[in-house]
Regions:
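Glyoxalase I/VOC metalloenzyme domain signal
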Residues: 1-38, 46-101, 115-171
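Short hydrophobic/aromatic beta-strand or adjacent loop that forms the aromatic wall/cage
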Residues: 41
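Short secondary-structure boundary/hinge segments and terminal tails
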Residues: 44-45, 111
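Short acidic/glycine-enriched loop/turn segments that link adjacent beta-strands
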Residues: 106-110
């Protein structure tokens, strides 16, 4: 039912060897405000309303770093209102000696990527142009939309996706 639909994530938890550099990037570059500290967990909150504003940062010396595989998160994405906000973040990162990828056009948004000092891969993605560039807002999520470069591979992509059964689907 719609009342049980996933509408977003409350926040994320990052476990890093040394949290100091990550904390600086979160607060000085990405605009998160330091919040309460409990033991080895420091909370950072992005100002404003909505989901995805909380980052819980844990300093866990000696913790085994993640390895790619099923169930492992590849990267964490943060929002940038537009190209100018993304460029400002990129400049702030470069001033700290952090290498950032060139901007990547992902059709629905534009992204840059960097490894923050704790080793986690971060993405900064623009809000624009948005997911309504190739279908009406009312139709979002009703069928699989693909960027033009992936359309030739639609059959193979769809063959590898599990069938979803939306609440309104009686099949």
């Amino acid at each position: 039912p719609a009342e049980h639909a996933i509408r977003g994530l409350r926040g994320i938890a990052l476990w890093v060897e040394d949290a100091a550099g990550t904390a600086q990037v979160l607060s000085e570059v990405l605009g998160h405000e330091p919040g309460p500290v409990e033991g080895n967990r420091s909370r950072f909150v992005h100002p404003g309303a909505g989901l995805g504003r909380i980052v819980d940062l844990r300093a866990v010396p000696g913790f085994w770093a993640g390895a790619m595989g099923a169930g492992v998160v590849h990267h964490v994405a943060f929002r940038a209102a537009d190209d100018a906000a993304q460029a400002a973040a990129t400049a702030a990162l470069a001033a700290r000696g952090i290498r950032v990828t060139p901007q990547q056009d992902r059709t629905y948004f534009r992204s840059t990527y960097f490894r923050e000092p704790g080793g986690v891969l971060f993405e900064i993605a623009t809000d624009a142009p948005g997911f309504a560039i190739d279908e009406p807002v009312a139709a979002l999520g009703s069928r699989l939309m693909l960027p033009a470069r992936y359309e030739p591979h639609r059959a193979a992509i769809e063959a590898n996706l599990p069938r979803l059964h939306p609440a309104h689907d009686t099949a």
